Amino acid sequence: MSLSTEAKAKILAEFGRGENDTGSTEVQVALLTAQINHLQDHFKTHIHDHHSRRGLLRMVSSRRKLLSYLQRTENERYNALIQKLGLRR
């Protein structure tokens, strides 16, 4: 249920600050958002998959913490990221 290498490369190119940037907050949030969206589609067909649902909740919590950090430290980058990803906060 992880993302393909091509999907990750596309996200890195779009949200990365440099060509080898894999750890910036924006990239981490974008990757988590893509995985969360993928899992949401999975749960539409596999309603009783509770083990994966726990993983989804961990990802959502991790993304929330990263977004809180970004909002606290660099509000302009936070607002741009929220708008680009279409998240509501």
Swiss-Prot record:
One of its GO terms (biological process) is translation. Pfam families: Ribosomal_S15 (PF00312). PROSITE patterns: RIBOSOMAL_S15 (PS00362). One of its GO terms (cellular component) is cytosolic small ribosomal subunit. One of its GO terms (molecular function) is rRNA binding. Keywords: Ribonucleoprotein, Ribosomal protein, RNA-binding, rRNA-binding. The keyword rRNA-binding applies. SUPFAM superfamilies: S15/NS1 RNA-binding domain. The keyword Transport does not apply. InterPro entries: Ribosomal_uS15, Ribosomal_uS15_bac-type, uS15_NS1_RNA-bd_sf. One of the primary rRNA binding proteins, it binds directly to 16S rRNA where it helps nucleate assembly of the platform of the 30S subunit by binding and bridging several RNA helices of the 16S rRNA. Forms an intersubunit bridge (bridge B4) with the 23S rRNA of the 50S subunit in the ribosome. PANTHER family: RIBOSOMAL PROTEIN S15, BACTERIAL AND ORGANELLAR, SMALL RIBOSOMAL SUBUNIT PROTEIN US15M. Part of the 30S ribosomal subunit. Forms a bridge to the 50S subunit in the 70S ribosome, contacting the 23S rRNA. Belongs to the universal ribosomal protein uS15 family. This is Small ribosomal subunit protein uS15. It comes from Shewanella amazonensis (strain ATCC BAA-1098 / SB2B). The gene is rpsO.
